[in-house]
Amino acid sequence: IGAANIDTLISVDKPLEVGKTIAIKHRSIMPGGKGLNQAVGVAKLGGAVRMLASLGRDYDGHRIMDYLHENRVGTDAFLIHDNTPTGHAYIYIQENAESSISVYDGANGLLCADDLEQNQHLFDGASYCLLQTEIDQGVALHAARLAKRHGVKVILKPCVVDVLDQEWSELADILVPNRKEAGKLLPGYVTPESQIAEFSRRGYQTVIVTCGEDG
């Protein structure tokens, strides 16, 4: 359950700076969004995946649906909106693999708790529910509560937010931030080891901090 959008990937030598123009080395456009990427990743590893997301009825939305079908991701619960475009993200990637992202939510921002209630059948037979705070955190929390009600484990990828609701420590079986996200959520904790220790102290059962080019 999460965001599905079109990503514009832009390769640059160095970070953007206010008032300066930098050359783009390469540009590519492809389906993305943390929810979509998780779904496709699991499918490529041989897992059976169904996704709930919100798209616009437009070219970008059709492109995303085609991509998911090609990768054997179930889309029968997708929500299609006539008057709101599909979301779009602009990702600036440096040579060291570090990145910065600007996001237009579009239809992703319309996903709501009622949509989850009407699609609870997605939890039937599921082992894990993959969530990200790229969608509204309140909606993600509601999804996690429903997952728990159906006996489904929750994996949370925090992003975009500066604060995680305290309830996540009870709902998330596995927390997977990258080191920058972890540092933003835990000011003053700069190493993955200290971040993991602090998340554990706050009640999280299993924490995996990813480290960009360092793995």
Identify the meaning behind each predicted range.
Residues 59-71, 89-93, 97, 115:
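Active-site-proximal loop->helix
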Residues 54, 76-81, 91-128, 133:
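Conserved phosphate-binding/catalytic loop of the ribokinase/pfkB sugar-kinase fold
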Residues 1-54, 59-73:
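Glycine-rich phosphate/adenosyl-contacting loop at the front of the ribokinase-like
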Residues 40, 88-92, 100, 215:
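Short beta-strand scaffold segments in enzyme catalytic cores
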Residues 1, 26, 52-57, 75-86, ...:
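Beta-strand->loop->alpha-helix junctions that form or flank phosphate-binding loops
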Residues 144-215:
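Conserved phosphate/ATP/ADP-binding segment of small-molecule kinases
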Residues 57-58, 134-138, 158-162:
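Short beta->alpha connector loops
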